[in-house]
Amino acid sequence: MSKSERIRSVVNSTLGKVTKKDILTKCPDISTAMVEMVLKSMLDEGLIRKVGGGRATAYVRND
C-alpha cells in the first residue's frame, strides 16, 4: 500500500473529524508535507471538507 493510499485509508476509516496530527500519529513514517499534499488532493476531489482553521483545522468526509 502506498503512502498516499495509507493516508486516504486513515481518513476514510475515521468517524467524524480527523486532523493532520491524527494521521501523523497513525503513520509516523510519512512526512507532514506528504500528508498535506494528499489532504489537499482529497479536498480538490471533493472527498473531504475542511472544518476550522489554523491549529484547529480538521477534515471530515463528504458522505
Residue ranges with predicted function:
Residues 1-63:
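C-terminal regulatory or interaction extensions
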